[in-house]
């Protein structure tokens, strides 16, 4: 066999490996994008629920203006956040503000007994559980993608094709506070 055939064989193998690595990385990248879109759907539902919850609380605890304003500001920041890092930080703030809003019900028995408040609180709790599940799926998908771009032979081609590490949906320093959905007691 001549050297030319050997070189051609090596080039063909490298091209096949490059195509295979590229296709796998595209698939993994699309999974990450879809997983983030799933989180986004849940967050939008939560954002839509918040104005009703604030209005219900306002009817019973209108002098708790600071807490209500905090929730409204946190919601606005969360709605306008872009990308996993910003969204996670904004949602972290919103979760804290919502926890304080729900805690107000302890001080207002009439609010706590209100059927609309109970329904909205239950919906919020359900959404928090769905968000937590979506977040876990997203982070697992990101882990799979990040591992994929570091494994051979994809690691040889990942940078060349523009595939870079993706960030986890991280809750930051106060992770313990928001790891579990807010507890809603009636």
For each predicted feature, which ranges?
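A helix-centric hydrophobic-segment signal that preferentially recognizes long
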Residues: 1-186
